[in-house]
Amino acid sequence: PEINVISNVKSNNGVPIGNLGDGEAVWHADMTYNNLPPKAGILYALEVPHNQGNTHFANMALAYEELPQILKDKIKDKILIHDSAHNSAGMLRKGYTESNDPSQTPGAKHPLVIRDPQTNKQLLFLGRRPHAYILGMEINQSEDLLDDIWQHATQEKFTWTQQWDAGDLLMWKNLNVLHKRDAFDPSTRRVMHRTQLKGDVKIAS
């Protein structure tokens, strides 16, 4: 499989050896801007600063289960555009231009509520918050509704935190959770290896 390096370390000539640096990576699921996102993610810690750069996970099945009925009704059968122009650090990817109109966001279109084929449970499928857009809604309505959903879905009661030690390996179901990374001291070293399992099932509501 392809191995990606996630690191803030630079080589002797000042070139980063990996991606994402030392800043915060906001809540997201990996590569949901693709029609078939990865079904699982794997992270392996080679070097990590003590109790910094923690990774947090939010359970989207629990978040949907406890979602107020009024919000469940509002998002029923809604389709969300998942932004492909920016990475999880909020940086614009090469080949894209910045836009202030979420309705013009490039990326895959997925149901806001999907079903886990193994458990048959419904779950929120949010991707990432910035630049997302709910099809068919006025922009301000889409923004307000997404803000409400995200505020609910990322409550601490739905989350779990991985405090990394060197040698830790973590695997998760990419479509079932959101994850984010804390920023950490840029003078420390953090080197992670990441790979993913290819998605093989069309996302269903």
Which residues fall in each region the model found?
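Fe(II)/2-oxoglutarate oxygenase catalytic core
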Residues: P1-M171, L175-S205
